Amino acid sequence: MEPQVTLNVTFKNEIQSFLVSDPENTTWADIEAMVKVSFDLNTIQIKYLDEENEEVSINSQGEYEEALKMAVKQGNQLQMQVHEGHHVVDEAPPPVVGAKRLAARAGKKPLAHYSSLVRVLGSDMKTPEDPAVQSFPLVPCDTDQPQDKPPDWFTSYLETFREQVVNETVEKLEQKLHEKLVLQNPSLGSCPSEVSMPTSEETLFLPENQFSWHIACNNCQRRIVGVRYQCSLCPSYNICEDCEAGPYGHDTNHVLLKLRRPVVGSSEPFCHSKYSTPRLPAALEQVRLQKQVDKNFLKAEKQRLRAEKKQRKAEVKELKKQLKLHRKIHLWNSIHGLQSPKSPLGRPESLLQSNTLMLPLQPCTSVMPMLSAAFVDENLPDGTHLQPGTKFIKHWRMKNTGNVKWSADTKLKFMWGNLTLASTEKKDVLVPCLKAGHVGVVSVEFIAPALEGTYTSHWRLSHKGQQFGPRVWCSIIVDPFPSEESPDNIEKGMISSSKTDDLTCQQEETFLLAKEERQLGEVTEQTEGTAACIPQKAKNVASERELYIPSVDLLTAQDLLSFELLDINIVQELERVPHNTPVDVTPCMSPLPHDSPLIEKPGLGQIEEENEGAGFKALPDSMVSVKRKAENIASVEEAEEDLSGTQFVCETVIRSLTLDAAPDHNPPCRQKSLQMTFALPEGPLGNEKEEIIHIAEEEAVMEEEEDEEDEEEEDELKDEVQSQSSASSEDYIIILPECFDTSRPLGDSMYSSALSQPGLERGAEGKPGVEAGQEPAEAGERLPGGENQPQEHSISDILTTSQTLETVPLIPEVVELPPSLPRSSPCVHHHGSPGVDLPVTIPEVSSVPDQIRGEPRGSSGLVNSRQKSYDHSRHHHGSSIAGGLVKGALSVAASAYKALFAGPPVTAQPIISEDQTAALMAHLFEMGFCDRQLNLRLLKKHNYNILQVVTELLQLNNNDWYSQRY
């Protein structure tokens, strides 16, 4: 909206100000009427002062708009001068002569007086012509009377007629105005009598010369008589003089125009006053409504144009995309030379003509040339039995599932196989020129070899050296001359005779990729009958890649693996021939033929060898009992399993935590002899020491397992395992130790199982009655009857021993194996290893190797030279593992030590030798205490009491950790 302009109008030293807005709301006719009414003038000439203080006349709407533009530049102020014009009264004869000349010249009837009024109203309130003068041409010419003056009777008649027409017109205008006012102000409907009161000379001009406007006051709702105040910005707002003096509900910033009476014509003040009474506000209201309608129309038109513009932009963008796409297609076709006049794919012009105006991007799928095929059916199913030397033709029904017609360059290419061809030189077979979606037959002629056996030949479609589609093959069984076809073989051969038309699984069976061909350069084919290798050069298709082959035709992992095995053992690979089953039931990997003579059924030994890394090995107890016998420690041989570092740590931690839990994963085998020289005291304490010594022996044996990777010993172990296995039973049972019971907290089971078990282990020299591999539960049952070991040293008594020296003892809980489990699963292979030896992966590996049990109190000669060498060889590995573990692992070590050395105190302190000192240092190194000087100083300080040394080291580490963190 334009800014408001103040008009300062001056007339004979009288100045009045008018506040106007844009020229659309307040027109030049409104300004002229307001000026005339304000200064009570009839004929005026308005001039304004421009920038050079020169007077410029205003006589039209355009000049008025220019004046407003000038006022905006002058601070929204416009100085205007009003000059009163002299009204010249037209004399009757000249207009009569002029009117006669007009009538004579035009030959038309002049307008009547009321029509003239209507025309004057439509031309912005211009001064109308004299109606009395125009009425004279209606008088018929009387030849007897002079033409200068009409007769009196005619003049009086016309005056009466004129008054009647004017009254009727004014009444109609008042009625229309009243209807509009009622619509705008419903309160006026209650007083229609006041508004529609019949007008007459007495009501129009009241005494005291007050004019009745026939308009209701917007404030008091009464008819305005006399002075009327109209808002200069809101033409429909009118109030009377009394309301203007008091408060009224309107914007105080709007200037009110004071109107005494409407503008009247100079010749007929009475008629024009009656006419102008209702027309002025009605005209303003109509203009306002029309402008509002125009504004709404313009707004809707702008929105429509804006939407059309957006749509055109989107269309142009889409056309640009399609044009860019067609350019790429044209460039792609021109590069790869598919400009064949017969093929519509080589004509990008036709594509542009047909698809340029298509908004959706549809030509992507139809333009890309794609080679693809699907296997439908065949004539000779896999496993067909033939006589030697039989000449036969293998047919494959193939469907062209791509969008390119097969040409002379499309051939069926030989890949590998040992089935004799009828023509050895013919490695590529022509295929029919199939159109997209058509089905055809591809045939190859073979000759059955002379020797009996299974023969195969693998083929694949190729276009200009680029392979595509599924791999097809022919697999037959050549019988000996005395045909011995059993019903089983016939049934096996006919299992996969039904075929269906599908593509997915058969394409997953594809064996060879063009990429593989480019990398290898040639494919080795080997026939079983001639035993000759015929290298075939594959075509280099890198420079001639013209057609797109979908990814579903690429080779699977099974095919790549089979291709790598092809050069290693072609005979064995040729026996693993998949059946030509229909594509919807083809297995994901090639099945083995039921009658293959070269592939043995994988036995327990192979399965055991494959599962050896995962650690899931066990044996049924029937085989274990065969090998279980009392063997002397001094006469056993070495046969150890190779373990990785991670498995060794897992096993060591589990063994240190669970001495009574589960069997070893190795079968009972010959054991390593250990030479140890020490004196064992008699009694329960001696048995406990003896068990600890056996634990040290076990760790030495474990070191031997890790260091000696002898293939002969591994084979011997495997043979031993296989000899104990059963052909009918290949189930594996894994008994997890007590520490894996997730329903119990770690404090209940983890450390309690780390205690010694003197009732379960014996030295082989003095007590050969109890086998080394016996289960803890069984040993507990046998001890009271068959052994002299006291009952109070059973596992229950050991479990009830406090593991932390001050806490409440544990409640003994000995769980026997269920009857369904083996009575004695694969037993341990060391005397001192009753714990679990399963390499089960543990989420948090404890840093407590079971070498910590090598130095109990009261033992005189505990560690031999082999233990020393083992500790030295392992301490670097143990320190590297313990260096990455957290404080919780150290607390586990301390708790295990407390549980280990919770036995009865010994008064006599043994003399510590240099080897024993080195062993203690190695223990500390494996637990992560790598400060040699500090360890040696603490050992001397605590008189080689490793429990006190570990406790003080833990306190030092905790203090250092807190000081560094906080």
From Swiss-Prot:
The modification Phosphoserine is found at residues 116, 590, 596, 625. This is Next to BRCA1 gene 1 protein. The PB1 domain mediates interaction with SQSTM1. Residues 4-85 form the PB1 domain. Homooligomer and heterooligomer. Interacts with TRIM55. Interacts with titin/TTN. Interacts with RNF29, USP8, MAP1LC3A, MAP1LC3B, MAP1LC3C, GABARAP, GABARAPL1 and GABARAPL2. Binds to ubiquitin and ubiquitinated proteins. Interacts with SQSTM1. Interacts with TAX1BP1. Interacts with IRF3; this interaction mediates autophagic degradation of IRF3. Interacts with IL12A and IL12B. Zn(2+) 2 binds at residues 231, 234, 250, 254. Residues 699-718 have a biased composition (Acidic residues). It comes from the Eukaryota. The gene is NBR1. A zinc finger (ZZ-type) spans 212-264. The modification Phosphothreonine is found at residue 586. Keywords: Cytoplasm, Cytoplasmic vesicle, Host-virus interaction, Lysosome, Metal-binding, Phosphoprotein, Ubl conjugation, Zinc, Zinc-finger. It comes from Homo sapiens (Human).
